[in-house]
UniProtKB/Swiss-Prot annotation:
One GO biological process term: apoptotic process
Name of protein: Aspartic protease 3
Disulfide bonds: 100-107, 313-351
PANTHER family, sorted: ASPARTIC PROTEASE 3, BETA-SITE APP-CLEAVING ENZYME, ISOFORM A-RELATED
Function: Aspartic protease. Part of the necrosis cell death pathway. Involved in neuronal cell degeneration. Involved in heat stress response.
GO molecular function, one term: aspartic-type endopeptidase activity
Species for this entry: Caenorhabditis elegans
Amino acid sequence: MSGRVFLLLALVALASAIQRIKLEKRTYTREQYKFGSIQEHLKAKYVPGYIPNKDAFNEGLSDYSNAQYYGPVTIGTPPQNFQVLFDTGSSNLWVPCANCPFGDIACRMHNRFDCKKSSSCTATGASFEIQYGTGSMKGTVDNDVVCFGHDTTYCTDKNQGLACATSEPGITFVAAKFDGIFGMGWDTISVNKISQPMDQIFANSAICKNQLFAFWLSRDANDITNGGEITLCDTDPNHYVGNIAWEPLVSEDYWRIKLASVVIDGTTYTSGPIDSIVDTGTSLLTGPTDVIKKIQHKIGGIPLFNGEYEVECSKIPSLPNITFNLGGQNFDLQGKDYILQMSNGNGGSTCLSGFMGMDIPAPAGPLWILGDVFIGRFYSVFDHGNKRVGFATSRTGK
């Protein structure tokens, strides 16, 4: 057999062994992007018992709405289509419900699931509630078939639990381009102890040889439609270069690992290994406030308000690399990676630092959160079977 034929067969085998989910993305104007609401959302997400400042939330979109990347799933028989945010920082699937009140604007502006129109759906009647900064997302639990993407290859059985939302809080989800949230964290943090859909996919060895999923995010500002891709059950070497550096999980709640160090121009900005959570559901990169302030000063950030720092757009090419050590390997963020360049509404651009200070008290913290600012530069692999997270340089990380 020639080498060319062997390579072709290998590529065909790889293609059949994994599922690819194309992601879409959305960008935001300076006016829409509010760090205060993002910070409150993350504290509500990661600090047990935290009572958010609702005024901060009402300044603008929450971090879920600022998250740029979402993709398709179907639910039910026949399939009902939804766009969902794939969130490694939570562990429940929920979509808007067909019977939500007429006055619930967020629900009415999105696709809604109707259990009565699905021959495979069972309405359990069990109540469901997730606390957000502007209130609670409330609904009931249904059981039905959930499929990744637009085909029926990677699907759960009809007993998969999901939340059908009848009430969505405040303005949090009104402007979101996605319909609901698809949690990809661990079942230990799942509301109502509902197992997530990936559990069933991982259990099906006929279609899933490796219990993992991977994110490749496109940060190309010139491509306004392609958001990237998620692969299920294997990695895709077309999306990264070099070896994957692995870091074991600290605990099976979030995708929590140890960050060894953060270094700029030879100066270390962290003191020893510190917990970090890899979160596809947040757009920023956060760390302890005292450390982030030093980083902002180093990159010439000008403090504004609510933790925002502005940087002159013209200085991006000369900004220093910021090096994160994970899994024994260094990962360099360049200025173009950690500066958010967005329209200011006047035909120009405003550049904001993608770093945000946030203090999370013990025992949950101190903590770094590696959001899309980091994941957009580095191919990120979430290995459920081996309880670890891996990173490699994205082939087109921009």
